[in-house]
Curated annotation (Swiss-Prot):
One of its GO terms (cellular component) is cytosol. It comes from the Bacteria. This is Leucine--tRNA ligase. ATP binds at residue 627. Its main location: cytoplasm.
Amino acid sequence: MHERYVPADVEAAAQSDWRAADAYRSKEDANRKKFYCVSMLPYPSGKLHMGHVRNYTINDVMYRYLRMNGYNTLMPMGWDAFGMPAENAAMANGVPPAQWTYENIAYMKKQMQAMGLAIDWSREVTTCKPDYYKWNQWLFLKMLEKGVAYKKTGTVNWDPVDQTVLANEQVIDGRGWRSGAFVEKREIPMYYMRITQYADELLNDLDGLGWPERVKVMQHNWIGKSFGVNFGFPYELDGEKKLLRVFTTRADTIMGVTFCAIAAEHPLAARLARDKPALQAFIDECKRGGVAEADIATMEKKGVATGFSVSHPLTGEPVEVWIGNYVLMSYGEGAVMGVPAHDERDFAFAKKYGLPIRQVIAVEGETYSTDAWQEWYGDKTRAVCVNSGKYDGLAYDAAVDAIAAELKAGGLGDKQITYRLRDWGISRQRYWGTPIPIIHCPSCGDVPVPEQDLPVVLPEDLVPDGTGNPLAKSDAFLNCTCPKCGAVAKRETDTMDTFVDSAWYFSRYAAPDAQTMVDARTDYWMPMDQYIGGIEHAILHLLYSRFWAKVMRDLGLVAFGEPAKNLLTQGMVLNETFYREDAAGKKTWYNPADVTVSFDDKGRPVGAVLKSDGQPVELGGIEKMSKSKNNGVDPQMLIDHYGADTARLFTMFAAPPEQQLEWSGAGVDGASRFLRRVWAFGFANREALAVRAPFDAAQLAEAGKTLRREIHGVLKQADFDYQRLQYNTVVSAAMKMLNAIEGAKGATPAVLRETYGVLLRVLYPVVPHVTFELWKVLGYADEFGPLLDAPWPKVDEAALEQAEIELVLQVNGKVRGALKVAKDASREAIEAAAVADGMFAKFAEGRPAKKIIVVPGRLVNVVV
């Protein structure tokens, strides 16, 4: 054993032992409790960041603790390898996305191995490999057969210069990110998955999940179940009588309708724009810019009057029709009723364009004014109808019932349940993704690729140039034969949304070599007992993976309908930011490692200079580590300098897993010092720690009993904290243990060996390398086996019992000292000890005790 702790040597030795033992390969065992813990698989961007380190360490700690407690544990890893960043990198570097992706995977895998993670690499999944995405294609075809997948036209962002479809994030201020051209909205045929068919089940099943309430609320709101009324405004055009249909949750305000707004893509808009250049120009303007709902929600609301009116369904009054840039064709009916008096968006729109505002609900004690919007204008809980004829005085529920009944009687509408959730459009007009297994035949139409011809393999040697889809230019991929009639045909060039790849990978981990999509091993491991990932995945990834599981269940592939029993959303890793701003307002961000900070006498930062030139930089505050703010810390540099165990210890100690973690160089130094202390104690006491002599706990001297009582008391708390995933307090417990062991005077070597062994096992899940090596070199492995499978230490309840207890001694209600008495001392004995104590004599000043109050186990108060 070396005197000095050298992390690189210790970690290399431990990892060598683990590789030789194939330590983390997991096998199904029906006779053992299983625990399947998964971190959301990373995108292979090139290097790990500290967010990865934190996520995977949390997973690893969980795995090791539960393995010590007898669970059959599994921690796999894979790569979410398709996606747009690879295409962008390929364009920038002139290499195929496949080459860039595989090189990144190789490097990041080495980084994970250097962290000492308990990953079963035999189950590794890479989503851009044909043996994985074959099953995306296979399930898509099954869904097509069942009607769960289907084709329809959908709206996309079209760059007219690059002649390509853009993702929402590639549209910046209405322009294409590469060409700078104004983006157009286009309708093209795309494939969809009928997730709305599962809307109620997706909502109801949230109740049974051990997920953060915040995530469940986000999914609940995204699904957005609404109870309302679907009805039509009658109109006549070109000799035909029709209805302009809308959906509303506020039918109680129908008498306040003063306009209707329709989407630019609405069929009525196109008809009304004939021979009206100004109206057509506005429609064209609306079709430019992104199609992202978030963008539309925040942009300026604009509208143009069409000069056409529909009839109010209950009064017959004319209602003017406008085209609004905020109305989405994909939501509801592509038309909305405008009630400016009681909808904030409509209120602003009406004020902007001078439209009538008609109050039709009132709240007692409130006064309505059209001068400015007030929150109560939209209140449906306290309001009653006014200015609404026969509906006056009705509260929300009664008004909706009555109005819906009248609309139904007139054949104009009825109550309806709707969802904010829309079917999942999976077609992407991109190269680097799962090919959609469809062949377009001039005679037969769209023909599914036969199952025996799967996978449709994506060529990996293409280099995108930003103009169009490379697959459409690849004759080798594009041209094929129709499997039905044998005619010359062409393949579908759209690829699948990458959320398809991440919707089921955890099921493939369970059976990575299966010749079917999944097998019996999947039902052994799934559902995941613990899933770990960022809050940013709360909606789309987690919702799609839940949908995918239910589809697989309904197809008879798996027995479960929810992929993850429990979810932990780890907090972000934050760091200081520093910048300089030029005359044009452009900020240049500097890495904290390149900056010297000065502090005031209270330790608060008051200034900073760049190390390279000594000139000031601005303090930008603490923000999430990111490339854009240049405030990241390279995990590899941290591992190279301090070792993986120090990195792991700091990330677990600095904050509870679900909270944000503020980076601290001093905290990293502190973690390193602690591990050196653990090693130094082992080295300094290596001979005493080698003593395996049994001992009778009851016969130990007081020093031994005191040490064991403290260690086993802290162990009890640490075990509880491990179970509730509070790893920061586990580390605190280990620090208390080391302090107690270092400070123990007179404890026998056997007691030191026992208590130091407890410390190593408590620390092991967090810092596996140094504890594994100490366990081995100090002889614990010879006695108990390698630390990998050493049992979790049991709390000795007898050690926690005390022969004496300490009571607070008060005189006339003021604390004057402490009193040690036998644990089972009688009230009379406690009273006698109190008046005999020197502190009582000092403060009583010769006065006799009038009354003695004893609070068992806590205090004794002598009144004089």
